[in-house]
Regions:
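N-terminal alpha-helical targeting/anchoring segments
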Residues: 1-99
């Protein structure tokens, strides 16, 4: 398992927990959700499109969903230094230097 697969699994667990708490609707499958290498002009280590994939189902803008999900991702992982939300709704993760 590589770092992108690891963080994709973490993100899936987080959104599943939000679903169980009634805070977020999720599809039957996680098709289309990814965690990947960000474009070179972004200062982050991983980028995910989770908010964009879930926005239509939740009837919220991708930016609104990303703003809701991103602090929860950061709270659950002590290796994350910063999380930024960028249009149209990507969540960009930067790790602490020790990682």
């Amino acid at each position: 398992m590589n770092i992108f697969e690891l963080y994709l699994d973490k993100i899936k667990l987080i959104i599943s927990d939000l679903n169980k708490n009634g805070e977020l609707l999720i599809p039957d499958t996680f098709n289309g959700i990814n965690a990947e290498i960000p474009p070179p002009n972004f200062d982050c280590d991983i980028s995910t499109n989770v908010a964009m994939v879930l926005s239509k189902l939740n009837k919220k803008s991708p930016l609104e969903l990303a703003e809701k999900i991103s602090p929860i991702i950061k709270e659950k992982d002590s290796l994350i230094d910063t999380i930024n939300v960028v249009k149209p709704g990507f969540i960009n993760i930067k790790f602490k230097p020790l990682f």
